């Protein structure tokens, strides 16, 4: 955490000159601190406990003021473990909220909630910092145009398009390609939009965070040789951190993203994995602060806390923050207050299907379960809307016929249904796509497919012009021209074998 000295007139008051407070009570990660009269800190101010424990080891714990208790006492939540703290220790008010480094120097680095690098690559080469608590952009600053955020991924752009500056919920279990999809989006936004990404690991498993970092280095999203060429900044608050850190790490990531949007005027992609853990941490802190629990034991301030985070994720006239949030649904209950509050903010949902992953169709995005508020004729245009609806109808009919096919076989279907099934299978395979970040695993070069090319390809399949091509020609290709070229190659190979 960078300490920002507070300025009063021409005098700068440093930490050493401030009147310190004293710890008077410790309840797990929550501290009560007494300050001299007239020296009370503001809500959200950062406090620092700098002392030595009983065996002489230095202690440096940052806290955030959450409540004013009266009688010159405040209640604060610690951002790191409170082991070794005792009553009577000195507490210094920094006079400002937690501030974290921002700007290009953060790319390719891993930070904790306080903005301290944790990747053993030395200090961050920037003096620019920003407080993690800021108000959402004013109405007058917002960009109200509804525009599609093109990802270059066919299934997303056609069937559940993302809104520029929108919020997307990513639903997927373990091993269905969520990490690879996240990395491809980070790669594509850098190439197609000249943008950058910020990844906020909120209450993640440490192993998963480490795996993501290693995979990003392997795929070139993080450039080890020239760290400044990296396309992403990582902010982690893992499962083993105190609830204060898990509750605020999302804001740290968002603050870094806001700088790229407002100052660098870039399109930014913000990943939050997992938004449920943000709510969970808030619930733990709420109980420790003595607030009365609300529905299902969640904090009474659930909607406000979620709103204060989500309202900052938006498009302004300078740039945009498009957010992709992994959503854990407790006990698969969509009416649980945590996911239900999240759904109210989402513009699109991308659902990953284990069934498609088992078939080898990647990205394993479920074309029928994924939704988007952007898929309307007045926003995407009649041609896009009609093509998307016909693709969905074809796939839905294929899904309905699958039981009949399994029991009686394809031969029992009508001629019309057999043709529809053949086209649906081509569509299903054409929704797959080779990824840039998966080149090291698959050996096939990645493809970025523009929206116009995507629509043209699916129109050709639906029109029946490509009925004569084998379905394997559509598997893991970019645009439709590659599929026809692949079909010719397959035909030549089969002729040679004869």
UniProtKB/Swiss-Prot annotation:
ATP binds at residues 172-179. One of its GO terms (biological process) is proton motive force-driven mitochondrial ATP synthesis. It is an enzyme of class 7 (translocase). GO terms for molecular function: ATP binding; ATP hydrolysis activity; proton-transporting ATP synthase activity, rotational mechanism. Its EC number is 7.1.2.2. SMART domains: AAA. It is a peripheral membrane protein. InterPro entries: AAA+_ATPase, ATP-synt_VA_C, ATP_synth_F1_bsu, ATPase_a/bsu_AS, ATPase_alpha/beta_chains, ATPase_F1/V1/A1_a/bsu_N, ATPase_F1/V1/A1_a/bsu_N_sf, ATPase_F1/V1/A1_a/bsu_nucl-bd. Its main location: plastid. It catalyses: ATP + H2O + 4 H(+)(in) = ADP + phosphate + 5 H(+)(out). The keyword Cell inner membrane does not apply. Gene3D superfamilies: 2.40.10.170, Bovine Mitochondrial F1-atpase, Atp Synthase Beta Chain, Chain D, domain 3, P-loop containing nucleotide triphosphate hydrolases. Belongs to the ATPase alpha/beta chains family. Produces ATP from ADP in the presence of a proton gradient across the membrane. The catalytic sites are hosted primarily by the beta subunits. This is ATP synthase subunit beta, chloroplastic. It comes from Nicotiana tomentosiformis (Tobacco). The gene is atpB.
């Amino acid at each position: 955490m960078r300490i920002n000295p507070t300025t009063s007139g021409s005098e700068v008051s440093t930490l050493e000159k401030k009147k310190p407070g004293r710890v008077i009570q410790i309840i797990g990660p929550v501290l009560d601190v007494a300050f001299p009269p007239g020296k009370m800190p503001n809500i959200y101010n950062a406090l620092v406990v700098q002392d030595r424990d009983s065996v002489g080891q230095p202690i440096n714990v940052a806290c955030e003021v959450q409540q004013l208790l009266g009688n010159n006492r405040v209640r604060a939540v610690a951002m790191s473990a409170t082991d070794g703290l005792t009553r009577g220790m000195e507490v210094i008010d920094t006079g400002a909220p937690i501030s974290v480094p921002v700007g290009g120097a953060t790319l390719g680095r891993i930070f904790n909630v306080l903005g301290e690098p944790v990747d053993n690559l030395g200090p961050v080469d920037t003096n620019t910092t920003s407080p993690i608590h800021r108000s959402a952009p004013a109405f007058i600053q917002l960009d109200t145009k509804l525009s599609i955020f093109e990802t270059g991924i066919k299934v997303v752009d056609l069937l559940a398009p993302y809104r520029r500056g929108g919020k997307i919920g990513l639903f997927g279990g373990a091993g269905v390609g969520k990490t690879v999809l996240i990395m491809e989006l980070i790669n594509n936004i850098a190439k197609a939009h000249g943008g950058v990404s910020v990844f906020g690991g909120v209450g993640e498993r440490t192993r998963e965070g480490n795996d993501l970092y290693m995979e990003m280095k392997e795929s070139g999203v993080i450039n080890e040789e020239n760290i400044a060429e990296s396309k992403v900044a990582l902010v982690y608050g893992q499962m083993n951190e105190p609830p204060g850190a898990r509750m605020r790490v999302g804001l740290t990531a968002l603050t870094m993203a806001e700088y790229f949007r407002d100052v660098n005027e870039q399109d930014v992609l913000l990943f939050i994995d997992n938004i449920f853990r943000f709510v969970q941490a808030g619930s733990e802190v709420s109980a420790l602060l003595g607030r009365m629990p609300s529905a299902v034991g969640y904090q009474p301030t659930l909607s406000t806390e979620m709103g204060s985070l989500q309202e900052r994720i938006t498009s302004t006239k300078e740039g945009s923050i498009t957010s992709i949030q992994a959503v854990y649904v407790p006990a698969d209950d969509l009416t649980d207050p945590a996911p239900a509050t999240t759904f109210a903010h989402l513009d699109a949902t991308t659902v990953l299907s284990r069934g498609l992953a088992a078939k080898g169709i990647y990205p394993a995005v479920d074309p029928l379960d994924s939704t988007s508020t952007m898929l309307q004729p007045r926003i995407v245009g009649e041609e896009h809307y009609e093509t998307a609806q016909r693709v969905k109808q074809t796939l839905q009919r294929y899904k309905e016929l699958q039981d009949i096919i399994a029991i009686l076989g394809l031969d029992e279907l009508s001629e019309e249904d057999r043709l529809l099934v053949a086209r649906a299978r081509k569509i299903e395979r054409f929704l797959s796509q080779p990824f840039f970040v998966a080149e090291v695993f698959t050996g096939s070069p990645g493809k970025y497919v523009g929206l116009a090319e995507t629509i043209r390809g699916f129109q050709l399949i639906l029109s029946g012009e490509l009925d004569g091509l084998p379905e394997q020609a559509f598997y893991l290709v970019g645009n439709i021209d590659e599929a026809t070229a692949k079909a010719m190659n397959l035909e030549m190979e089969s002729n040679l074998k004869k």
